[in-house]
Regions:
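Domain-length functional cores that host ligand/cofactor binding and catalytic or interaction surfaces
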Residues: 1-99, 198-200, 211-396
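Charged, compositionally biased non-catalytic regions
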Residues: 78-156, 165-166
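Short N-terminal edge-element motif at the start of the domain
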Residues: 135-217
């Protein structure tokens, strides 16, 4: 595997150098324009915008109704804190002995291990669906051919997939730790549940300051729905000192207002986040598989039952190169959507122009608030929050 990776890397570098050489050799403006036209024409449009206008035109009569429903949904959704009132739950903690995955830098892996979350998963006493649907696990592909392979989740091997990305926020490079879980299925929670379907999951993202201390946590479904921000209590205190007053109709000082869209949901702060010696605790609901709340330290009263299991911390890269017979294949189709995980929600919301609404998808393809913003936009936090000066350390 290491040799194949090195060969691919070297070949890619050689191809890039050759292409850059051809670009540098262009001396005439017309030649540059021709090259640029061909270059941009070869770039496939992102799933974030692909076919949006066509879908709206094809479903024109329903567009006003769907857009009105979205506006109502955004305006009236509950935005406050929730309590993890679980009758029964199982706790999953990271396995400290997990070896560093190939291709992950040692320093990055140490950070991912250090802040790997504890997951408290609610269990229904008498679910109307198989109980394993409420357990996250390891993802695999099954079938005969790569293009028809079907994904499955092995709940006997609880696994959290993690990676680090970096963004410039307020003029400084901010490390963001991403942790993703996958369930076998989103069960039907009613007679008609448009969110039901194969594979379900959740992602949390922890933004660190220059001293590698957590400052805030973002939470989102793997399809891009239900995006929320949980700032650390210390960060909220800094916003209070910087701004003095809350904005109208806001509970927290750090909450911002978006003039051209929907304001972010910021339910509550996380006391002790910046000083927590290890990972946060996530409280995940049964059935819907939504994050209920986050704690810096798990309170014994918040965790019913006494069962606990270790989970494997794995590199997110594994999802993009899963073992499949004598080769490797991705969990995701070329458009970034999880294989065979269609939702009825996609059909219902197609008049809005959304591309496969509710369909779980790959990192860097998630849109939030009904495609209003890109989850991986470096300016996302500055768009939605009134960050205090130097929120992540020295900078602008």
């Amino acid at each position: 595997r290491a040799a194949a990776f090195a060969a691919y890397r070297d070949d890619s570098r050689a191809r890039l150098r050759a292409e850059l050489g051809r670009v540098r050799a262009l001396t005439e403006a017309a030649a540059v324009a021709t090259y640029w036209t061909a270059f941009t024409a070869a770039i496939e449009e992102s799933i974030m915008t692909r076919g949006r206008l066509a879908r709206k035109l094809l479903n024109a009569p329903a567009v006003p109704f769907i857009n009105g429903w979205i506006a109502y949904h955004n305006r009236h959704d509950y935005r406050g804190p929730l309590e993890p009132k679980f009758g029964d739950a199982i706790t999953f903690r990271p396995d400290p002995e997990r070896a560093r995955p190939f291709g992950t830098a040692r320093a990055d892996w140490r950070l991912l291990q250090r802040y790997a979350p504890t997951v408290v998963q609610e269990r229904s006493a008498q679910p109307a669906y198989p109980g394993e649907y409420d357990r996250f696990g390891s993802v695999a592909l099954h079938g005969e051919q790569p293009d028809t392979a079907l994904p499955a989740v092995d709940t006997d091997v609880p696994t959290v997939y993690a990676y680090i990305d970096r963004k410039r926020i307020q003029g400084v490079e901010v490390r963001q730790l991403n942790y993703t879980i996958w369930y076998p299925r989103h069960p039907a929670m009613s007679l008609f549940d448009p969110e039901a379907g194969a594979l379900d999951g959740w992602t949390v993202r922890i933004s660190l300051d220059q001293a590698d201390r957590p400052r805030l946590v973002e939470s989102v479904s793997n399809c891009g729905c239900y995006y929320k921000i949980f700032p650390g209590a210390a960060l909220e205190a800094e916003s209070r000192a910087a701004y003095g007053d809350r904005l109208t109709d806001k509970t927290l000082y750090i909450e911002g207002h978006v003039s051209d869209g929907v304001d972010a949901v910021v339910p509550e702060t996380i006391p002790g986040l910046e000083t927590a010696p290890y990972g946060i605790t996530l409280y995940m609901s049964a059935g819907h598989h939504q994050l209920v709340t986050i704690r810096a330290h798990a309170s014994p009263g918040d965790i019913p039952g006494d069962s606990a299991r270790a989970y494997l911390l794995a590199a997110y890269d594994e999802l993009e190169q899963l073992p499949f017979h004598d080769r490797r294949a991705s969990l995701f189709a070329p458009d970034g959507l999880v294989r065979e995980a269609h939702r009825r929600e996609c059909v219902l919301l197609s008049p809005s122009g959304l591309y496969h609404a509710g369909h779980p998808r790959q990192r860097e393809t998630q849109m939030i608030y009904f495609d209003e913003a890109n989850l991986d936009d470096p300016g996302l936090l500055e768009r939605y929050l009134r960050l205090p000066p130097r929120a992540f350390g020295a900078g602008a």
